[in-house]
């Protein structure tokens, strides 16, 4: 267990994002910082995109009919009444409408916001974070540009010049926040060698990185491998990393474990950042397929076959585009892998919306518009991104499940075509084996 010991300073933590999952993570972290005051500053900043909320008359927080600022409601009543209602938040969570003020002097940045806002947020953060900050991305999805694919933790690291790991798992935010039983998650963090002897040994990774996209990122000073080492796929890191000062506790597996682990939220630490990140993104495509099957009422036999095919394509995709950097056991054994797939294919939002679409005889896009107020599912955006990459690489035929799900979403294929994937996938595996 990490301990401050002779360290003169403590880590300050900021949660960037305050939605359902962001508020849940803030709750977890704030409980831990309160218990481990020798390692962390007790107060946890949570950046909130300011908006007005109307408190219902039957609410114990009702004061007037006038809309109130969400940050003021959270700080006064310690509850995110809009995105995590009914859950009491620790009083040491400070809701802050100013992004730059929220991250001031923070050495641990936890990113938990819709991926479409990440670029703008990183742009606003430039020049406002301490140079030795480290990040954890809770954002599920991938960033595809042309024939290359980037992880969101890579985007964060490149844009801000910091190292960033990833958190993902079989996590239903409302259940975790309510402390219903014990949930689990996986945190992938491979400390850069510049952080003293605390670092894990970097592993070689695939060169399948989109250099075109990378060139759009800020120019960062290249340093020697001896100081910064390699990034999440073995390339010489472009960012000039600043080591965590020796006056702070090390930011390693032990420190992150006590920051995120709770009696109701079990954390497994690994170094496979690519495997954890990809699992969190690709499982949403599989969940859509499972939802289509459920909507058809085809039963558990077809359901299990589709999930198996989905796992096979997830593993194949990860190894093809990220090479030896991905540990198969991350996908097959960790919460971020198979457990998240199972949960998403039983009760996840992508699953439920896909099933609803089939039962109503409408498109998933119509469900998004009517049931989600126009908000896009993670699965639909990821399916489109992944298909764009596969098409650019001429690899659509080698990923029949991923391809057919996207074609169903675009109205180019029927849900009835899904069972054929089992045979097609078997042939694909045999040909590539």
UniProtKB/Swiss-Prot annotation:
Q: Which residues bind substrate?
A: 140, 349-350
Query: Where do Polar residues bias regions lie?
Result: 208-227
GO CC term, one of those recorded: nucleus
Entry EC number(s): 1.1.1.8
- Residues annotated as binding NAD(+) are 17-22, 49, 117, 173, 349, 378
Top-level taxon of origin: Eukaryota
* UniProt GO MF annotations: glycerol-3-phosphate dehydrogenase (NAD+) activity; NAD binding
- Which transformation does this protein catalyse, written as a reaction? sn-glycerol 3-phosphate + NAD(+) = dihydroxyacetone phosphate + NADH + H(+)
Disordered as annotated region, ranges: 187-246
Q: Which UniProt keywords apply?
A: NAD, Oxidoreductase
The positions flagged as active site in the entry are: 283
* Entry keyword annotation includes Oxidoreductase: yes
Record's protein name: Glycerol-3-phosphate dehydrogenase [NAD(+)]
């Amino acid at each position: 267990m990490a301990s401050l010991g002779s360290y003169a300073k403590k880590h300050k933590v900021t949660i960037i994002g305050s939605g359902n999952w962001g508020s849940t993570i803030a709750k977890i972290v704030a409980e831990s910082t309160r218990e481990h005051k020798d390692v962390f500053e007790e107060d946890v900043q949570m950046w909130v995109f300011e908006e007005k909320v109307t408190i219902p008359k039957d609410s114990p927080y009702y004061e007037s009919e006038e809309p109130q600022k969400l940050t003021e409601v959270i700080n006064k009543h310690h509850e995110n009444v809009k995105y995590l209602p009914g859950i009491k938040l620790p009083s040491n969570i400070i809701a802050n409408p100013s992004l730059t003020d929220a991250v001031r002097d923070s050495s641990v940045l936890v990113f938990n916001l819709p991926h479409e806002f990440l670029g703008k947020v990183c742009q606003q953060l430039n020049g406002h974070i301490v140079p030795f900050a480290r990040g954890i991305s809770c954002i599920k999805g991938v960033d595809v540009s042309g024939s290359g694919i980037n992880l969101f933790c890579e985007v964060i690291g490149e844009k801000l010049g910091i190292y960033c790991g990833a958190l993902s798992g079989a996590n239903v935010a409302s259940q975790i926040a309510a402390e219903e039983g014990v949930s689990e998650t996986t945190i992938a963090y491979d400390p850069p060698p510049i952080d003293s002897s605390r670092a894990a040994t970097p592993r070689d990774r695939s060169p399948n990185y989109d250099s075109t996209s990378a060139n759009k990122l800020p120019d960062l000073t290249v340093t020697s491998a001896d100081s910064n080492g390699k990034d999440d796929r073995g390339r010489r890191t472009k960012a000039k990393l600043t080591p965590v000062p020796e006056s702070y506790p090390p930011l390693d597996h032990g420190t992150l474990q006590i920051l995120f682990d709770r009696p109701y939220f079990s954390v497994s630490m690994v170094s496979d950042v690519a495997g954890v990140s990809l699992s969190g993104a690709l499982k949403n495509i599989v969940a859509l397929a499972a939802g289509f099957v459920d909507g058809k009422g085809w039963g558990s036999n077809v359901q299990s076959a589709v999930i198996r095919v989905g796992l096979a394509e997830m593993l194949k995709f990860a190894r093809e585009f990220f090479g030896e950097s991905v540990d198969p056991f991350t996908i097959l054994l960790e919460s971020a892998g198979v457990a998240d797939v199972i949960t998403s294919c039983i009760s996840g939002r992508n699953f439920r919306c896909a099933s609803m679409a089939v039962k109503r005889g409408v498109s998933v896009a119509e469900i998004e518009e009517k049931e989600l107020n126009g908000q896009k599912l993670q699965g639909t955006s990821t399916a489109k991104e992944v298909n764009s990459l596969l098409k650019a690489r001429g690899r659509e035929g080698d990923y029949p499940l991923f391809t057919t799900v996207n074609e169903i979403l675009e109205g180019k294929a029927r849900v009835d075509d899904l069972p054929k994937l089992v045979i097609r996938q078997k042939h694909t595996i045999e040909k590539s084996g």
